[in-house]
């Protein structure tokens, strides 16, 4: 079955993504921390089963940020999951280019996901040691 991609909807954050972050033991980011209040990304499906999703921040420079990649931990088709993640990152990256970005940035810790980004032409920048966030 072919995979399909669609934009995130108003309810995907609560209905799907929060559960996925929980499956992986991660704290979900606040909805208003994400692009377009949680709707600024895309989701990949295998039929009616959601596999993975991710976000794209656009900036006031030529930089786009592709991040917050998350997947359904219990989706068991390993090869299709890998392909879905590649498709997700590739499509988000393509969208960045279409809207005028010259550079695409990502902050990733997961080694498997780092490998996916590298396979798609991303190169490693500096290794960071701390994420710094301040809530105003």
Predicted regions and their residues:
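Conserved acetyl-CoA-binding loop-helix of GNAT-fold acetyltransferases
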Residues: 78-94
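Conserved acetyl-CoA binding element of GNAT-fold acetyltransferases
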Residues: 62-80
């Amino acid at each position: 079955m072919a995979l399909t991609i669609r934009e995130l909807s108003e309810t995907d954050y609560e209905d799907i993504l929060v559960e996925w972050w929980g499956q992986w033991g991660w704290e979900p980011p606040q909805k208003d921390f994400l692009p377009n209040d949680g709707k600024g990304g895309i989701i990949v499906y295998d039929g009616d089963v959601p596999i993975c999703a991710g976000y794209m921040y656009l900036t006031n420079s030529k930089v786009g940020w592709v991040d917050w990649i998350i997947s359904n931990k219990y989706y068991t088709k390993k090869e299709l999951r890998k392909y879905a993640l590649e498709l997700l990152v590739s499509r988000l990256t393509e969208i960045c280019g279409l809207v005028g970005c010259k550079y695409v940035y990502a902050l990733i810790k997961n080694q498997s996901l780092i490998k996916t980004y590298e396979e798609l032409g991303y190169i490693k920048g500096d290794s960071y040691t701390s994420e710094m966030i301040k809530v105003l």
